[in-house]
Amino acid sequence: MTVQIENRDNGIQVVRLTGASASKSFSRESLPIIADAIDKGLKNSEIKGMVITGEGKFFSAGADINAFQESIEANEAPQLIRDLTNILHPLLMRIRESSTIVVAAINGAAAGGGLGLALACDARIASPKAKLAASYASIGLSPDGGTTWLLPRLVGEQRSRQFFFENQIWNAEESANAGAIDEVVNEDELINRSIEIAINWSQWGNHFREATKHLLHVQTLNDFETHLKH
């Protein structure tokens, strides 16, 4: 089983990516399973908060690089990218728009599309072993998974330029200092602290959570007068 689901008290669900779903999250095999597991939690009215985490060295390592290299050599990369983004991008939108509070408990590497998954969450808590990486430049592809939209909103445009164009890898402390991660906690505290935040943020009514997430989402897209009308 590549995704483990654990229901906790107070309407909190822990979604743990294991095995290939953590180390090669965005493959044709793993991504549909991940999306289905997260979607079921988002659609469940009894789940008010969700914690997404990984296993071992990986939170979510993004694409299967070998599969991408093979698709490039076979001139099939555009179709592979379409197949994956047709699942990933709607999933990220549902996370952003859902009334469910979603917390990323980043235990290890969040790379490529896995970085997009972490950035789309409402909060990001990390262990000292966490790493954030884009990892697109090395395979000649532009960043995906909404990372070029999400990261600048957290750390600023110029800091994001440095991150992408220098193909940087941020450790937990660097990520927190930049503003990409909210807190760094001891490894053995990661899940409990993430659950604590999910409980705290999800204690309010469904409409408040959904409307507030929506307003925060659109606040940079509209001028102030238009924003006041939402």
Outline where the language-model segments fall.
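Crotonase-fold acyl-CoA enzyme core
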Residues: M93-R209
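Short, conserved glycine- and acidic-residue-centered signature motifs
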Residues: S27-S30, L84, A111
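Conserved CoA-thioester-binding segment of acyl-CoA-metabolizing enzymes
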Residues: M1-E55
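C-terminal alpha-helix plus adjacent terminal tail
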Residues: M1-N10, N44, N167-E173, D188-H230
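Glycine- (often His-adjacent) and acidic-residue-rich active-site loop
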Residues: A22, G54-P90, G140, D223
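Terminal peptide-recognition signature
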Residues: V15, I33-I34, I52, D64, ...
